Amino acid sequence: MNPLLILTFVAAALAAPFDDDDKIVGGYNCEENSVPYQVSLNSGYHFCGGSLINEQWVVSAGHCYKSRIQVRLGEHNIEVLEGNEQFINAAKIIRHPQYDRKTLNNDIMLIKLSSRAVINARVSTISLPTAPPATGTKCLISGWGNTASSGADYPDELQCLDAPVLSQAKCEASYPGKITSNMFCVGFLEGGKDSCQGDSGGPVVCNGQLQGVVSWGDGCAQKNKPGVYTKVYNYVKWIKNTIAANS
């Protein structure tokens, strides 16, 4: 089980057999400024995604932890200075105390910004969930990630994918013995579209609420192997308590 260190969104060509030479592409270029809560975590290079939940706090994945992180907000094309980005260093990086790097249970992390983000057309917050994600709900997954099944082909512009929440039973059947109550699956059991090696820590937003954090998966766009995400609803109390204790 490998964490998705660079999330992308993939769709295998259904009319052709899958092989390592196929370039799996999927999703679409997000409309600029349409995902204003999406952030890029940078340590000299983009390595993970995250979500702005208030002016000074970001949610990401526990396995994205680094001792020094610069949070980049208002990004669309990460290779171009577009003029409205905000680059803010992390003041505190707090991984969940029960994070398990082997099972990726409790794969969630909070980042406190050293200064408050300026909310504008390019940068805004996303709400925490008020209920767990319902089966069948369509969600938006976003990030900058590898669009090649073999080798590396990283998009400069933010990518988006629309995908449904799968039932917990189907999720557990896809990964026997590996799915905890803190995880859920989003995607397509028939394969063809998936998150794949890229932008862990990035958002899964359903009905305007941050329901998931990109966590892990087995391969890309494989049949019966959907993407696995941290269930943010289970951590709302921890998030609120941690923010209050570190204000």
UniProtKB/Swiss-Prot annotation:
Q: Which stretches are tagged as propeptide in the UniProt entry?
A: 16-23
EC number(s) recorded for this UniProt protein: 3.4.21.4
Cofactors demanded by this protein: Ca(2+)
Q: Cofactor stoichiometry and binding?
A: Binds 1 Ca(2+) ion per subunit.
Q: Which Gene3D superfamilies match?
A: Trypsin-like serine proteases
MF annotations from Gene Ontology: metal ion binding; serine-type endopeptidase activity
Q: Which SUPFAM superfamilies match?
A: Trypsin-like serine proteases
Tell me the outcome of changing T137M.
In a colorectal cancer sample; somatic mutation
Which InterPro entries would you find in this protein's record?
Peptidase_S1_PA, Peptidase_S1_PA_chymotrypsin, Peptidase_S1A, Serine_Proteases_S1, Trypsin_dom, TRYPSIN_HIS, TRYPSIN_SER
Q: Where is the Peptidase S1 domain?
A: 24-244
Write down the superkingdom of origin. Eukaryota
Q: Active site located where?
A: H63, D107, S200
- PTM: Occurs in a single-chain form and a two-chain form, produced by proteolytic cleavage after Arg-122.
* Residues spanning the signal sequence: 1-15
At what residues does the UniProt record annotate the site feature described as Required for specificity? D194
A Gene Ontology cellular-component term:
extracellular space
Q: What is the effect of changing Y154F?
A: Lack of sulfation
Sulfotyrosine occurs at Y154
User: Which cystines does this chain contain?
Assistant: C30-C160, C48-C64, C139-C206, C171-C185, C196-C220
Its annotated compartments are: Secreted, Extracellular space
Q: Which GO terms describe its biological process?
A: digestion; extracellular matrix disassembly; proteolysis
Kindly state the subunit structure of this protein. Answer: Interacts with SERPINA1.
* Role noted for this protein: Has activity against the synthetic substrates Boc-Phe-Ser-Arg-Mec, Boc-Leu-Thr-Arg-Mec, Boc-Gln-Ala-Arg-Mec and Boc-Val-Pro-Arg-Mec. The single-chain form is more active than the two-chain form against all of these substrates.
Please report the name of this protein according to its UniProt entry: Serine protease 1
Q: Which organism is it from?
A: Homo sapiens
Name of the gene? PRSS1
